[in-house]
């Protein structure tokens, strides 16, 4: 049978009752722990400092009189400040690491009633992390007034038991609410995007380091940056504002002035001093979209502001300070800009700690339907006009939106515009098939203008030498290739009829040879698509 071993602090307040016989009239948690009829403590290891040695000896004698089978062991520790979390945790952590546990022979309990609140928290953390393979035990005084000298009650808390899963499930529910918040409540289905949001959630809560968001225009970089700030504000991590600027709009002296501010007379026309966006973001978040467009001087000053949280306003010889978190957005490959000498390598290294690439809408076809529902609801909240799709109209729009013809070059911004147009033309709050067909034609027209550029990007001037008949067919083939996961999958879709009558098929080889007629390869089509 395993022995029961308990650890605890000598309670300098609760365990102290003087030295006379009157001490037996006071409830003392450590003594009463050893008086429980249903629990026999075989060994009690009491932690105390040198000043509490006398109190420990008194407890040891009293325990021997009420529970002679209990061995009481002195564990002398040195604590300068029992309310200092770092010191107490380090002390108990060292104790746990140095103790020779024998869980196959002994059952361990941690008495958390004595000791400071800091000590109780540290006991809990060490038990939860399994540095101490023990259950928690809490003692309480007797409830009945007619039994003032009774041993009271004890409660054992096993952090491994399923009854405490409810606590863990609360954290899980809260975390899911956080993920939904970052996604604006949209039930996204794309696994890559969902994994990325889970990572962003952890970074947003635990880190204040710069975050770099890559992705095409309209993929939601600015929106996500704002949600990250709101999440931090909800957790009381930030109290400042969200400050946003597109760096592509900053040129010349106005770039310095806009970002870092200026003093009066810094340049022609500077009649008043200006605070600048970095100072406006103090205590909050600064979102620099298209950060790759910043000039060399601005990059150097931004690096100093990130690292030292100080900078010089334009035209000033006095430093100012601003403590903000930076989120940068870009559609360009900053690594390539660094290689070309157009972007500072040290700045890139500083903002590249947390990098996330937001996929475009075309890469998240599973999320088109839930985002459609979100945009419909958003339109209703903005305008007060509730609209709904007819079943046939909804089916037709989704079929086109997820087809190879739908390039969604404007991504979610374009999807939002599409919903706005259909909602505007809705009759009596219903989006009909006629409205959807008009919208599909409008989108087709918009996207047709961009199609030749895909061929031109692949073939250059040679694209002009291809007949219109072949060019239109090739464009459609390329669109399907870009939607397919593999060469074989694209071949099966393209040769879906002719392959039925053949005993053996090699769709991948047929497609490879077709592309080769125009000097193209599967790899070239995919590479150009991923970089576009």
UniProtKB/Swiss-Prot annotation:
Regions recorded as binding DNA: 485-504
GO cellular component: protein-DNA complex
Gene Ontology MF annotations: ATP binding; ATP hydrolysis activity; cis-regulatory region sequence-specific DNA binding; DNA-binding transcription activator activity; DNA-binding transcription factor activity
Assigned keywords, A-Z: ATP-binding, DNA-binding, Nucleotide-binding, Repressor, Transcription, Transcription regulation, Two-component regulatory system
InterPro entries: AAA+_ATPase, P-loop_NTPase, RtcR, Sigma54_dep_tscrpt_act_RtcR, Sigma_54_int, Sigma_54_int_dom_ATP-bd_2
Biological process (GO), any one: phosphorelay signal transduction system
Any single Pfam family the record assigns to this protein: RtcR
Superkingdom of source: Bacteria
Keyword Transcription regulation: yes
Amino-acid positions noted as binding ATP in the UniProt annotation, renumbered to this chain: 215-222, 281-290
Residue span(s) of domain Sigma-54 factor interaction: 186-424
UniProt xrefs under Gene3D superfamilies: 1.10.8.60, P-loop containing nucleotide triphosphate hydrolases (3.40.50.300)
The UniProt record lists the keyword Transcription regulation: yes
Protein name per Swiss-Prot or TrEMBL: Transcriptional regulatory protein RtcR
Species of the source: Escherichia coli (strain K12)
High-level lineage: Bacteria, Pseudomonadati, Pseudomonadota, Gammaproteobacteria, Enterobacterales
């Amino acid at each position: 049978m395993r022995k029961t071993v308990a650890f605890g602090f000598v309670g300098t307040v609760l365990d102290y009752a003087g030295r006379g016989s009157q001490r037996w009239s006071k409830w003392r948690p450590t003594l009463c722990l050893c008086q429980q009829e249903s629990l026999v403590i075989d060994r009690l290891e009491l932690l105390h400092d040198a000043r509490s040695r006398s109190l420990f000896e008194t407890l040891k004698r009293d325990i021997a009189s009420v529970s002679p089978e209990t061995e009481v062991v002195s564990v002398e520790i040195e604590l300068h400040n029992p309310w200092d979390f770092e010191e107490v945790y380090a002390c108990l952590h060292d104790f746990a690491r140095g103790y020779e546990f024998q869980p196959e022979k002994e059952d361990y309990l941690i008495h958390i009633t004595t000791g400071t609140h800091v000590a109780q928290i540290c006991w809990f953390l060490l038990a939860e992390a399994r540095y101490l393979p023990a259950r928690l035990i809490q003692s309480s005084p007797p409830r009945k007034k007619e039994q003032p000298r009774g041993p009271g009650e004890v409660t054992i808390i096993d952090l491994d038991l399923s009854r405490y899963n409810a606590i863990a499930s609360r954290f899980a529910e809260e975390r899911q609410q956080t993920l939904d918040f970052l996604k604006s409540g949209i039930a996204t289905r794309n696994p890559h995007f969902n994994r990325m949001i889970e990572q962003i959630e952890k970074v947003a809560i635990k880190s204040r380091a710069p975050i770099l968001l890559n992705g095409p225009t309209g993929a939601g970089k600015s929106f996500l940056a704002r949600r990250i700030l709101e999440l931090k504000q909800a957790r009381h991590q930030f109290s400042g504002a969200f400050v946003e600027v597109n760096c592509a709009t900053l040129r010349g002296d106005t770039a310095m002035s806009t970002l870092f501010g200026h003093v009066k007379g810094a340049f022609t026309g500077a009649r008043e001093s200006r605070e600048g966006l970095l100072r406006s973001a103090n205590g909050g978040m600064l979102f620099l979209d298209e950060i790759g467009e910043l000039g060399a001087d601005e990059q150097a000053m931004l690096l100093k502001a990130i690292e030292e949280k100080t900078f010089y306003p334009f035209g000033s010889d006095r430093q100012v300070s601003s403590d903000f978190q930076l989120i940068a957005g870009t559609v360009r490959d900053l690594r390539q800009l660094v290689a070309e000498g157009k972007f500072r390598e040290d700045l890139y290294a500083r903002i590249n700690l947390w990098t996330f690439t937001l996929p475009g809408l075309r890469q998240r076809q599973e999320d088109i339907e839930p985002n459609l529902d979100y945009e419909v609801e958003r339109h209703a909240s903005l305008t007060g006009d509730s609209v709904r799709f007819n079943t046939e109209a909804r089916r037709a729009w989704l079929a086109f939106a997820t087809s190879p013809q739908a390039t969604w070059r404007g991504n979610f911004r374009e999807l939002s515009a599409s919903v706005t147009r259909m909602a505007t033309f809705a009759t009596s709050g219903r989006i009909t098939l006629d409205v959807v067909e008009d919208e599909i034609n409008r989108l087709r027209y918009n996207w047709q203008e961009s199609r030749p550029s895909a061929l031109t990007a692949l073939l250059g001037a040679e694209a002009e030498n291809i007949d219109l008949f072949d060019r239109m067919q090739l464009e459609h083939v390329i669109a399907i290739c870009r939607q397919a996961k593999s060469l074989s999958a694209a071949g099966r879709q393209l040769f879906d009829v002719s392959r039925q009558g053949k005993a053996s098929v090699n769709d991948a080889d047929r497609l490879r040879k077709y592309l080769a007629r125009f000097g193209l390869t599967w790899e070239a089509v995919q590479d150009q698509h991923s970089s576009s």
